[in-house]
Amino acid sequence: MRFLEAAEAFLSSGRDLLPFAPFPAATDREAYEALPDALKQEIVAEGEKVLGFPYPPIHATDFMAFRRTGNRINYEDIYFGRRYALNSLVLAECVENKGRFLDDIINGIFVLCEESGWQLPPHNSYIRNTPQEILPDATRPVLDLFACETGAQLACICYLLKGKLDEISPFITKRIFSELTHRIYEPYLKEHFWWMGEGEEPMCNWTPWC
């Protein structure tokens, strides 16, 4: 039974899902106050290092460089730098709970949502072991390990900080849901990617993580 068939069967069974709570949301102050003081200080200090983070732009030619020269480092330095900074800001806000990291978090959310593709240039293909496209097709997302990781990152931010973000504007989390639907849910359910495994197709570490 394929995933979509199994999901439809479960939903039609009338059974309820258990509340999703993999870790404490920012509203659970008891959980965050219970952290060791040294750890809280370290988390806030890491967030302070990236206050005002400029989120450097990724140019189309940065993506194109992999096909042209084989260089993936320049693109990935910017790509992962954005995500690491955003993670530090989110954790710092969860611990401190004063709102001073929120503007930079919102900037980071929209920067990620406005990327043309979440996949890395070396993974920009739909069939395994075929040449990568030189640019991402924003109308047909590719699900690679890091596209799925970006989706998970934004989903976790929404889970952790939804209340705070919605107080500023409901359009922040609405944008996250929109991007997750277009970039993650729909291609996962409607497309077949080589790492999914079907019949004799080989699977890999991407299979469980994606």
What is the predicted role of each segment?
Residues 49, 69, 124-126:
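A generic structural micro-environment signature
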Residues 1-22, 29-66:
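Low-complexity, Ser/Thr/Pro/Gly-enriched N-terminal "stalk/linker" regions
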Residues 61, 68-75:
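Amphipathic alpha-helical segments and their boundaries
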Residues 44-48, 73-77, 118:
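Generic hydrophobic, helix-prone segments enriched in Leu/Val/Ile
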Residues 65-68, 120-122:
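Generic structural "secondary-structure junction" signal
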Residues 29, 76-210:
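Aromatic-lined, polymer-binding surfaces characteristic
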